[in-house]
Each structure stands twice: as C-alpha cells, then as structure tokens.
Amino acid sequence: MKHKLFILQAAQPSTPGTKQRGFSLVTTLILLVVVTMLGIGASQISLLAEKSTRFARDSQIAFQAAEAALLDAEFDIRGPNTSAAQRLSTFVTGNSVGFVDGCGTGAGLGLCLPAASGAKPVWYAGTVDFTDDSTSATTVPFGKFTGRTLSTGESGIRPEALPRYIIEIIPDGTPGLNATTKPTLYRVTAMGFGPRKSTQAVVQMILRKE
C-alpha cells in the first residue's frame, strides 16, 4: 500500500514594503481626489466671478442708458430743441392738455396724468410697459422728440434697445405759491437696457419748469 506525502507550506507573511506600497497608493488616490475637487471649486469660483463682473457691467450700461433718457426728456421739456418733432409748447405753466390717463400716443406720446390719490403710481402700476417698442407703445423712445441719437444693437458692449421714458404732470404742493402762476412739476421715469434687454435699470427725476 502506497502512501502519499503531503507537504504543507506556511504562507509567507507580507513584507513591510508591500504594506507601504498599498498605503502609498491609497494616499495618492486621496490626494488626487482632493486636487480634483479643488480644481473644480476654483473653476466654479472663476465662473461665478466672471458672471458677476459681466452682470455689473451690463447693469452699469443699463443705468447709463436710463440716465441718458432722463436727459433726453429734459431736452423734450425745457429745450433747447430744434427737432422738427419738438413739442416745447406743450410744457408751459398751467397747461395739462395732452396729458391723459394711462399715457398718451401720437404727439402726446408718454404724457401721463398721475394716478388717483391712494392708487399705485402710473410707472409702477403695470399699466405702462417700458419694454414695448411696438407702434402701440405709450412710452417715448430716446430721441423721438429731440432728434438726438444713441448707439444700440445686439452686438458689442452697448444697450440692446433704446431707453424709454414717460412724463407725468404733478401738482406743486409748495406752500404759499399762487395756484395760477406757480411752476409746473413733471415727474420723469425712464428705463434703460443693457446689452441684453432683460438687464434693466429704472431712474426717476422731478423737474420744475419755471
């Protein structure tokens, strides 16, 4: 009878070098993940900074366009104005002809009576759409009655559309003034646009014409 001899060999214990190589691999992977996350975070911060800068620039362009519309309205009301479309005779003391509820059209474009006491102002009530540039719009585009021009367009760093304004005639409540001779007050509200029309700025002034 033959007997088979089995020799059992004990497993060799791992050497310190093997453990170190495994630890180094894990450490490298962790560092790689950390560096990747830092890179993604830096990219996002850079993108947000770029968007913030662009928004600030576009808002500034819209604000400057709105201020330009206020100045255009002042020329419309006070002059000097040599445009064939000028309407300086409308803005005389005591005259409210052409000013209507909801703002006028034609020669009276953008001329508005103030809202009733306790009601929302005309410029805030939603009855006036400053973004409407159609033929039925009730706001005045820059240069309409003054002949002045402003560069606009969808390309370049400039307003996409012309700024627009309305003019409300409002009572002067200054005590002691004669009702028949006191100066007329006009409240001008203007909206300007940035390189994208969705970027908007609204400014307002009250103008007293002596």
Give each language-model segment a name.
Residues 2-11, 19-28, 32-33, 38-210:
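Terminal alpha-helical segments
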